[in-house]
Every structure is written in C-alpha cells, then in structure tokens.
Amino acid sequence: DILAAFRVTPQPGVPPEEAGXXVAAESSTGTWTTVWTDGLTSLDRYKGRCYNIEPVPGETDQYICYVAYPLDLFEEGSVTNMFTSIVGNVFGFKALRALRLEDLRIPTAYVKTFQGPPHGIQVERDKLNKYGRPLLGCTIKPKLGLSAKNYGRACYECLRGGLDFTKDDENVNSQPFMRWRDRFLFCAEAIYKAQAETGEIKGHYLNATAGTCEEMMKRAIFARELGVPIIMHDYLTGGFTANTSLAHYCRDNGLLLHIHRAMHAVIDRQKNHGMXFRVLXKALRMSGGDHIHSGTVVGKLEGERDITLGFVDLLRDDFVEKDRSRGIYFTQDWVSLPGVIPVASGGIHVWHMPALTEIFGDDSVLQFGGGTLGHPWGNAPGAVANRVALXXXXXXXNXGXDLAAEGNAIIREASKWSPELAAACEVWKEIKFKFKAVDTLDK
C-alpha cells in the first residue's frame, strides 16, 4: 500500500475519526452518498483506510491521520495520477477546516515503475569529472531584461572565474527581450570559451520550460544539438507529465536535468494546509530530475535546519529511516532509484560557505546569484571569491575542522591570500536574514 500522513483540522463538532474516514474515502473510492454501482465492484479491495489517528502535540484541534491506499488505485509510473487521487478534491472537503499531506510512503513495487532521475549523483560527477566537493553555481541577474549577448557574457565571466554552472532564472523562458534560441546560442558559446580557458567542464542550466510540451521538447532537442551538458525545467508550473517526459528524453540523450521548484511555497509553506515539501521532493525523485532546489537553512528563503536535512536525505539516500525529529513520518526504501543533488540557493554569500558545506556535504550544488554578481569588482572576481571560499571550507572539513564553530575564522584566513574573497567578505559582512520559519516541526 501507499501510506499517507495527513494533518487534519476538522470543523468544530466533527470528531477526528469521522474526519479521518472522510479523507480516506474521498481520496479513494468514496463519494457523498451510497450508490448502487458500489455493488458491482469489490470495495474492500480498493478503498482507502484510515488506520491510525494521533493528536498533534500542542494543538487542540489537529490530528495526524494515517491512510493506506491499495496500489491498484494508481497507474504505474504516473506521479500525476497518484497526486490526482491523494491530493485531489479531498482538500476542498467542507467537513475539514484545513488539510495537509505531511508525508507519503511509496512501496518498492510502485517505485520500480518509475525511471526516476535521468542520471543521478555518481553519473553526474563522472560526466563533469568533479569529485570531493560541492558544485558551485550562479543564477544570472537581473533575472529579466538582459539581451542574449549580455546574458551570455555574464555566464562566461562567472564560468571563467571558477564556477561549475550558471543558471537561467526560473522565469526566463522566451520573452520579447531575449528569445530562447538566441540565449541558448550565446550561453553555449560562453560554456565552450570558459571550458577552453579553464580546462574544466562547465554547464549552464538552459531553461526548457515552455507553454506547451511540444515547445519544451523542441528546446531540449536544440540544447542537445548544441552539445551542452544540462538543461532545466520548472517542474511544478510545467507539470509532472511534462517533467516526466523531459526526464525520459534527458536519460535517452545524455542530458542532465536541473529542476526548479517555482510555486512550491504556494503549496507547502502553511503549516496546517497544503502539502509538505518532502512530498514534492519524493514526487520529483520519481518523476525525474538530477538537481532540485531544497532550501538553504541560512539564506533568504524559508527552511528550518532539521526539516531541510530531512528533505536532503530523501533526495539523496537509497534508504531513509522514519525520524519524526526531522519530519520523516515513514521509512522509505528507494530500491536503487538514482539520487537527486540538493541545490542551496537564495540569499547566500561567502560568509555562509562553511555552514553550507557542513549542512549539505559534498553531494550538493551551492548557488550564489547576488553572492557572485554583487561582487564590487565584477562577475569573474565574484566567482573567484566563491571558489576560494569553497576550497578553504572543503579543505578544512577534510582536515577534521568544525565548520560550524570555526567557519568565520576559515574564511578570514583564506581572504588573506585572496583579494577577491577579501572584497566579498567586506561587502557582505553585515547581511543577515533573521526571521522565524513558518513551517516548523511539532514540539
């Protein structure tokens, strides 16, 4: 069975048992009344069952309801169909004030019907010939308004300075100021020029997201013809069906696939309604993607440390044990489905490098947009500063240093021999984002 953990807030006067049974019925075989065609099928075989209800600590009217769904309810290899049932009409049910899907346990038999990520972590490292450290990226800013040639120039400077990747912003598709084909051509030129100068393999996440699946595939095919290593998709706004098709194309044609999660906070940020990001991350691992943005813990966007580390384990590891202290409600066995590299992006800079290295480990992408392009000397020195800071943090971690305690000292020491890093340290020494997270663990 597929197991689901729902956070249920019933309307006043509705007992939790009734609310849990309603969730199980409405998201599987049930409707609002008894119908004569019920007698033509084996309801006991197909109906969802609410098998456990727990009160939420510290809340008077919230419950975690556990529901089991028979596997025969779902089409094989279709995240779209799975979500249509489990998070469909039931979320508008009048008997509930709010409903949130906290976690899913996907059985191994169902996992095996999915291709999953096009390549996975090890294959990506082998393609790039980069080992033993996080990868470095940069989102090109301003996100909208640059011409294709200026955009390509910004990519080249960042890649030449030492970054592994540059990135289209999620809302860069094919607008009047920069059509997609022009951007792809100038970015490919930037990649090849930077590779020739540095001797390293470089990439730019070319955003293939489009208004139709046919147009999306046309962009992916053009990227492959240019010989670039990686493309990108906005998987929530683009949709799971489009994403799965693109992931299959990427595996067949040797392209890495970077996934952006634009729109996720509409779904996952409120604590009592919607869907926790760990569910979206599991769905992405099944649908397919080699990278996905997972929060930073230390940057400008929402993300509590323990919850974020729970996402990261679910994305990368083959087997993840139940651990309620990190928001993981079920043990998940991925049966060798390739892993997804978590991407930390949003309001991060060189002072965050030791903390990011300690939190995310080697198998991650650390992405500095403003933290590269905001360098007072330009894009290439900004990239140099990030590469030096990463090298210093990775060397200190390998030598057994405590990055959480000694991080600032490590960066200060490295800045003594890197003027680019010293300038970056001076610019961002006062920048902090100190706000309480909205989506927190139950105490």
Swiss-Prot record:
PTM comment, free text: The disulfide bond which can form in the large chain dimeric partners within the hexadecamer appears to be associated with oxidative stress and protein turnover.
Swiss-Prot/TrEMBL cofactor(s): Mg(2+)
Binding site for Mg(2+): 167, 169-170
Cofactor note: Binds 1 Mg(2+) ion per subunit.
Reactions this protein catalyses: 2 (2R)-3-phosphoglycerate + 2 H(+) = D-ribulose 1,5-bisphosphate + CO2 + H2O; D-ribulose 1,5-bisphosphate + O2 = 2-phosphoglycolate + (2R)-3-phosphoglycerate + 2 H(+)
EC primary class: lyase
Binding site residues for substrate: 89, 139, 143, 261, 293, 345
Active site positions, chain numbering: 141, 260
Other information: The basic functional RuBisCO is composed of a large chain homodimer in a 'head-to-tail' conformation. In form I RuBisCO this homodimer is arranged in a barrel-like tetramer with the small subunits forming a tetrameric 'cap' on each end of the 'barrel'.
Described function: RuBisCO catalyzes two reactions: the carboxylation of D-ribulose 1,5-bisphosphate, the primary event in carbon dioxide fixation, as well as the oxidative fragmentation of the pentose substrate in the photorespiration process. Both reactions occur simultaneously and in competition at the same active site.
Family: Belongs to the RuBisCO large chain family. Type I subfamily.
Name of the featured protein: Ribulose bisphosphate carboxylase large chain
Organism: Sesamum indicum (Oriental sesame)
